[in-house]
Each structure stands twice: as structure tokens, then as C-alpha cells.
């Protein structure tokens, strides 16, 4: 049976460096997918950037709804703008940072109903360059 999910029903996650709303996941009945709406604010002077994270068991597909940013990954740096999509393979450390003057809005998809298993995320930068 099809189901409708609204942004108002989304679970707010307390993740460092961004606002993240989990709209669809195993917690609300999904069997094999998680979808999040993520807003990365414009960095403030002196603010410590968040560190890279990884998802060991699954890919992450990120679609840019609005704004400008860069995804720093073990395989390289990828500039992003509205309409771009980046696919991160399982286990690759990565972080997306806002490089624009307005919030960076992303839609993130994972082929798993529970992405907490295998996700490792430190609080601050470790290993990738600061980008402001």
C-alpha cells in the first residue's frame, strides 16, 4: 500500500553541522530505503567544520536542491550546485560543506531502512581540508 509522508511528520535528527530531517526510514515503515532532507548552513567565522563520516554497509546518493557546496571524499573533491547528484560508495569517508552564501539544501537517499548501523561520524574535522 502506498503511503504519504509530510515534512511536518519528519524526525529531526541532532547531527553535527547541519539540520537533518529523516522523512522516510524503517522507523516509519520503510523496508529498504531512508530519505533525509538536509540543510547545511553558511559557515560562520571561527566555526569548527564537521568531520567526515562513512556508511560501511551502503551507498549514499545526494541530490542538491539549492545552494553551492563541495563534497570532500577520499577519492577527491566534488563541487556541487543545484541539480547535481553525487553517489558515495559504501565505506568511503566524505563530508559535504557549504561554499555559498545561502543554505545548502540536499535530499539524501540510502538503500537501507536503518542507516545507523555502520555509520561512523566524528564531531569535528579529521583528515579533510577546511573549506569556507
Regions from the PLM with identified roles:
Residues 36-56:
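Conserved short histidine dyad/triad with adjacent acidic residue
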Residues 70, 90-116:
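Ligand-binding loop in jelly-roll beta-barrel domains
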Residues 32-34, 58, 103-104:
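A structure-centric signal for secondary-structure junctions around beta-strands
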Residues 26-29, 85, 99:
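Short polar/acidic secondary-structure junctions
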Residues 22, 35-39, 61, 77, ...:
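Conserved hydrophobic/aromatic beta-strand scaffold that supports enzyme active sites
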Residues 47-49, 56-82, 89-92, 97:
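A short beta-strand-loop-beta hairpin characteristic of the jelly-roll/cupin
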Residues 28-31, 40-46, 68, 112-116:
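Short, charged/polar surface micro-motifs in flexible loops or helix N-caps
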Residues 1-35, 51, 117-132:
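A short, N-terminal "cap"/entry segment at the start of jelly-roll beta-barrel domains
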